[in-house]
Structure formats: structure tokens, C-alpha cells
Amino acid sequence: MNEFWLQINIIVPAAGIDLVCHEMTELGSAGITVEERALDTFVVPDPDADIPETLILKVYFPPEIEPEQLARQVAERLAWLAPLIPGLEVVTPEISRVRAEDWAENWKQHFGIQRIGSRLVIRPTWEAFSPDPQDAVLTLDPGMAFGTGSHATTRLCLEALAELYETPPGPQRVLDVGTGSGILAVAAALLGAGQVLGCDIDETACQVALDNARQNGVIEQIAVTLDPLETLGGDFDVVLANILAEENARLAPELVHRLAPGGVLILSGILNEKEQLVIDAFAGRGLTGPDIRRQDEWSCLCYIKEA
């Protein structure tokens, strides 16, 4: 393990966390933590202003990356994202060096064991845990480029997914669209899915998903692909899409086409105010629903394909 890591702090509106995390992963980030931003007591807020909640991303990169080049690349990615994330400030970030053990300890302060539903457990490697016989335990490590399951969009998906496996064996064929680090795909396999396919447009994300599947002992059940959604076969028992509302809406015909009759469609990454955009896009497509779950400013829509 590297003795030192490069750390960049980025202030991000809450609604843009997933997009910024994705771009940092593409740049080669080895880990990201999210912290609440303390308010500046010397600034009197305008009561009429619509100020989005902001969070601090602490992004860690391997020490062999050249710092000045990294700072420029991060600034370029933020400039590209600025039109998509209202309130995102485009600055050239300062880079600091932190000890590897300091990063790991920072991770440990923020994440503990999470139980999602009656069977799924997310366990950091440093936490001792005695699982029940029916538990599906997903193990995380601070050195893994892996979502923690604590972000609302991911947690809503995990909750909806876990409910499908309350009584084993549960759905067997699962498609995870925009798999990213693979946390949803790995969870599905651990819960009992026999065949899980993750697809993503990012080659790095696909490799990370495979690494995480291997780490959790489900590599035989999971495949990943860069192939476009429209080229994939259908008849999946579950289709997961934790992507932006606009992408869910745009991909509506293809997502529904991938579902087997009676299959479950779980859509997340949707801001509350964009629920209707997604609902309208999936109307009239032979679906029952949606069942809507909400956490903070995020929504998750669940449909069943009519037989």
C-alpha cells in the first residue's frame, strides 16, 4: 500500500455529488469520502436566495500522479460539469499529501455496519460482525474504489433490491445499467441472483466492478460490458438504473425492453422535482406502478412489467 496519497478537496452542491464522483473516478481516484460543510458564521445568508446544500468531497489519488497536471485535469472536469450542476464552483484545486493511514482512519470515522432490509449487510473490513445464516454480507475496504451504500440514490436502490430477496431464491437474472463501482451488481449476486450483468460506458468503472465482485466472492455470477444498452438481450427479472433522471427518461424504451414479463424495474438517481419527468417517460409502456421511495431530495421509482 502507498505510504502517501494526494488529496483534493472539492466543494460540491449535494445534487451534483454523483456526477463529480464519476468524473474523479475516471481521472484515477483511488477513493472518495463525503463530508458535510460547516456554515461560515460570518456570512449572513440571503433569506430569499435558493442556496443548495453543499458538501465537501475529499478525493484521493495515487502519489505517482503529477500534482500540477492533476490539478489542471480536475479543473477541466469541473468546468465541463458546471453547466450540469447549478452552484458548482470551477477552481483549480490545491493538492495536499496525506499519509495512507490517515486516509484509512478518516474513512473509518464515517462508515460503520449498515443493515439494509432483513438480509443485506454492508460491512467495512475493520468492523467485526457475526452474520446470521440468512445474511448477505457485502464487504468494503478503504482501499477500494467502491460506493459505500450510504448515498441516498444507492441506498434507495439497495432497499428496493433487498426486498425482492426477502424470501430466497428471488430473481435470478439482473441487469445493472450504469454499474459504476458495481455495488448494486455485487449486492444482487450476494442476495442470490445467479446471473448479473453490469453495463457502463466507462472502461475503468467496468474493471472496478469486476475487482469488487472478485473481492466479495461473486465473480462467477457477474459479467460487465461496455456494449450499448440497445445491443443487450432482454428477459431480465430485474433491471436497475441508478442514473440521472434525464438518462432514465431517455432510455425508457430500452430499459423496458430488457425486462421479462413480470420483471421489476428500479430507477434511481432522480431528484424529487424531476419525478414527473421520469413518470411521464415510462407512461403507456406496459408497466404497473410506480411505487415511489424518497430519501432527502432523491426519489426511487419501482415498476413491474405487465405479463
UniProtKB/Swiss-Prot annotation:
Location(s), subcellular: Cytoplasm
Annotated EC: 2.1.1.-
Keywords from the UniProt entry: Cytoplasm, Methyltransferase, S-adenosyl-L-methionine, Transferase
Catalysed transformations (reactions): L-lysyl-[protein] + 3 S-adenosyl-L-methionine = N(6),N(6),N(6)-trimethyl-L-lysyl-[protein] + 3 S-adenosyl-L-homocysteine + 3 H(+)
Gene Ontology, cellular component aspect: cytoplasm
GO molecular function: protein-lysine N-methyltransferase activity
Domain of life from the UniProt record: Bacteria
Database matches in Gene3D superfamilies: Vaccinia Virus protein VP39 (3.40.50.150)
Cited SUPFAM superfamilies: S-adenosyl-L-methionine-dependent methyltransferases
Keyword S-adenosyl-L-methionine: yes
UniProt-annotated binding residues for S-adenosyl-L-methionine: 154, 178, 200, 242
InterPro entries attached to this UniProt entry: Ribosomal_L11_MeTrfase_PrmA, Ribosomal_PrmA_MeTrfase, SAM-dependent_MTases_sf
GO annotation terms (biological process): methylation
Disulfide bonds: none
Family: Belongs to the methyltransferase superfamily. PrmA family.
Function: Methylates ribosomal protein L11.
Name by which UniProt lists this protein: Ribosomal protein L11 methyltransferase
Source organism (scientific name): Syntrophotalea carbinolica (strain DSM 2380 / NBRC 103641 / GraBd1)
Gene name per UniProt: prmA
